[in-house]
């Protein structure tokens, strides 16, 4: 089983565009508001050096065991959002 986690925040137009693009691509994802999931997001920032949203954590799971994790922090532009969607599709 694979899992897509999207880190986002309220009032972020890029986050809204990314959510819409994921929905249009029929990609299931867990939306993590960085204000509610601060500890989790802080670990993401520490691992990537990226403090901007939207950002992804992609995980391959076998049962409860994480077999692979990819971190993805696309630039905030229209083309990169769609490129990020393609990377997510290819990972899944």
Each PLM stretch: what is its role?
Residues 60-92:
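Non-catalytic, surface beta->alpha helical segment in thiol-disulfide oxidoreductase systems
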């Amino acid at each position: 089983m694979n899992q897509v986690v999207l880190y986002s925040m309220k009032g972020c137009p890029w986050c809204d565009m990314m959510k819409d693009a994921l929905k249009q691509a029929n990609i299931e994802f867990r939306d993590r508001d960085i204000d509610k999931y601060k500890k989790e997001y802080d670990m993401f920032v520490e691992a990537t050096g990226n403090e901007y949203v939207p950002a992804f954590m992609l995980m391959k799971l076998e049962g409860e065991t994480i077999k692979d994790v990819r971190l993805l922090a696309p630039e905030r532009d229209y083309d990169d959002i769609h490129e990020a969607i393609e990377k997510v599709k290819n990972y899944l």
